[in-house]
A protein has these predicted regions:
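Intrinsically disordered, low-complexity segments enriched in glycine and mixed charged residues
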Residues: 1-53
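Active-site core segments that coordinate phosphate-bearing ligands/cofactors
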Residues: 43, 54, 59-69, 79-90, ...
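Conserved alpha/beta enzyme-core scaffolds, especially Rossmann-like or related mixed alpha/beta domains
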Residues: 69-74, 103-105
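Gly/charged, well-structured mid-domain segments that form the phosphate/adenylate-handling core
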Residues: 108-112
Length: 286
């Protein structure tokens, strides 16, 4: 509800040609949203964003500050990059109160980002090549180089990403449209859905509810659960992400009966991860 964010959303809503969906503007994982949300004075946003990008770039550190660059995949994560035109979007930057001049030079993901000797560790400088965002790197490493191929990575949450080829695709079902990478002069795009609670569900079962001692117990408990159980769990501890984007949603359990026990509850919690991933994949298919 920060006024800077509300102002940006209002301006972006009038610029439908930019391809920015409202749920993306609300997504705190985007850098522009986080920076605006932290600032009390709009004129400080550009300065703070420039420093945040500089500190966060491995390239800048590797080159001793000689290069201020990012690749296309990381640029797309700022919410300030025009995904269709392949450049910093002046209208979006203006909406967030950010000067495009403070943003890094965008380089092909397999391009030359500079030279490094690792702070004098190497006898001679070597070129820095191959820069990707984390989810994009996982997509590439899993061999999803063709349209229609997808990956799901699991950690605290989960990222489900699908390669949609060399043409921009705007999701109508709550997914984020983004860039996969730009290599050999060819840009490829993705659809992505992020789930907030995946592995964190098992951590919650262990640390907060103390229903398990370690995640390995979950499989045995799932097999031990009553197969007729119809318990369902929604891990909306911080709302729901893609494809629902319901920030006011709360966690809940359905279908508990007198015979519901530890095994049935743990199974429902474990299955909630799969159901969330299914929702994202179903949105991709649609």
């Amino acid at each position: 509800d920060h006024p800077g964010v509300n102002r940006a959303q209002a301006q972006l809503a009038r610029r439908s040609s930019l391809g920015c969906r409202r749920h993306v503007c609300e997504n705190p994982s985007h850098l522009a949203r986080r920076i605006v949300g932290r600032e009390h004075q709009a004129r400080r946003v550009a300065h703070q964003l420039g420093h945040a990008l500089a500190r966060g770039q491995l390239v800048t550190q590797l080159t001793g500050g000689a290069e201020f660059r990012c690749d296309w995949s990381n640029a797309s994560r700022t919410q300030l990059f025009d995904l269709r035109r392949g450049c910093w979007s002046e209208p979006v930057c203006q909406a967030f109160g950010i000067d495009p001049a403070c943003l890094p030079q965008v380089t092909d993901s397999d391009g030359l980002f500079g030279m490094t000797d690792l702070g004098g560790f190497l006898p001679a400088p070597v070129p820095v090549h191959g820069v990707l965002g984390d989810s994009h790197a996982a997509l590439f490493a899993q061999g999803c180089h063709s349209r229609g191929m997808a990956k799901a990575t699991y950690g605290t949450g989960s990222s489900v990403m699908m390669n949609v080829g060399d043409e921009f695709v705007a999701s109508l079902h709550g997914l984020s449209s983004s860039l996969a990478w730009r290599m050999d002069g060819v840009t490829e795009y993705v659809l992505e859905g992020n789930v907030s609670y995946a592995g964190a569900v098992k951590t919650w079962l262990r640390d907060d509810l103390e229903l398990i001692n370690n995640p390995e117990e979950v499989t045995d408990l799932c097999y031990a659960a009553n197969p007729a159980s119809r318990v369902y769990f929604v891990p909306a501890f911080t709302g729901l992400g893609a494809p629902h984007w319901a920030s006011d949603a709360e966690g809940c359990v359905f279908g508990m009966t007198r015979t519901t026990g530890r095994a049935e509850f743990v199974k429902a919690a474990d299955e909630s991860i799969a159901y969330q991933i299914f929702d994202v994949i179903d949105a991709m298919v649609e």
